Design a protein with these regions (language model features):
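Non-catalytic accessory regions flanking glycosidase/transglycosidase catalytic cores in CAZymes
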Residues: 1-122
Length: 122
């Protein structure tokens, strides 16, 4: 069996989905997305979409996730320390346009993503 190595100029990277990493599901003007209404499931417990968010009865994984919203600087530093050169992320629409009916975007949401992009450029 031969060993395969990556070339020295190989670009390592990471990717995340906003609803799986950000948390802060109701912070700074963000309103719930369908992912925020999706409950935790298990092998014997199917996930549910609840019309009303009921935190007394269900756990919602997207509500905290890995809390990238509050820890993106540390997370980006960890990725840089690991030598990652690429980062793909999605943007949560309900952080920018909370209900989808706004004529102007949510400034706090825009600022959050701008801050991430500035941190990535360091």
């Amino acid at each position: 069996m031969s060993q395969t190595t990556f070339p020295k100029n190989f670009y390592w990277g990471a990717a995340v989905a906003a609803n799986q990493c950000e948390g802060a599901w109701n912070v700074d003007g963000k309103s719930p997305s369908i992912a925020d209404c999706l409950t935790l499931g298990a092998v014997d417990t199917p996930r549910k979409i609840t019309l009303d968010i009921d935190t007394e009865r269900y756990l919602y994984p997207s509500h905290r996730a890995v809390d990238f919203y509050h820890h993106y600087k540390e997370d980006i530093k960890l990725m840089a320390d690991m030598g990652l050169k690429m980062f793909r992320m999605s943007i949560n629409c309900t952080r920018i346009y909370p209900t989808g009916d706004e004529s102007e975007p949510n400034e706090a949401g825009l600022q959050f993503y701008e801050d991430i992009f500035r941190e990535l450029k360091k």
